[in-house]
Curated annotation (Swiss-Prot):
PROSITE patterns, per the entry: POTATO_INHIBITOR
UniProt keyword annotation of Zinc present: no
GO terms, biological process: response to wounding
Signal peptide region: 1-27
GO MF annotation: an example: serine-type endopeptidase inhibitor activity
Keyword Transport: no
A GO cellular component entry from the record: extracellular region
Protein name per its UniProtKB record: Ethylene-responsive proteinase inhibitor 1
Domain of life: Eukaryota
Keywords: Protease inhibitor, Secreted, Serine protease inhibitor, Signal
Location(s), subcellular: Secreted
Organism whose genome encodes this protein: Solanum lycopersicum (Tomato)
Chain segments annotated as coiled-coil in the UniProt record: none
Length: 119
């Protein structure tokens, strides 16, 4: 009986792991081109920004990339974003607006699976 419980837990873990792999593959299939790694992308019209001094509010090009890499890109593009946090996709989080925060929603492999946004 003990062995069956362990086997069920192992199978459940493997299902979660495999499903998170497929989620990251679909994000990588978007054909987003990141040339040499740490290129800075600029937004020319900052009048639409809801946060003063923030020049870019979202990074769709970071879908499918490792969280550590995404954090480096975001902080290089805008040093005012001092709070770049990583959350497992589906985790609970507060919905308050903070102009210094970007949340990276990742899968179990630490791959970004949602577009990172300021807030």
């Amino acid at each position: 009986m003990e062995a069956n419980k362990s086997m069920v837990k192992l199978v459940a873990f493997l299902i979660i792991l495999v499903s998170s792999c497929f989620q990251s593959l679909t994000a990588q299939d978007l054909e987003i081109e990141v040339s040499d790694g740490l290129n800075v992308l600029q937004v020319h019209d900052v009048s639409q920004s809801f946060c003063p001094g923030v020049t870019k509010e979202s990074w769709p090009e970071l879908l499918g990339t490792p969280a550590k890499f995404a954090k480096q890109i975001i902080q290089k593009e805008n040093p005012k974003l001092t709070n770049v946090e990583t959350l497992l996709n589906g985790s609970a989080f507060t919905e308050d607006l903070r102009c210094n925060r970007v949340r990276l929603f990742v899968n179990l492999l630490d791959i970004v699976v949602q577009t990172p946004k300021v807030g």
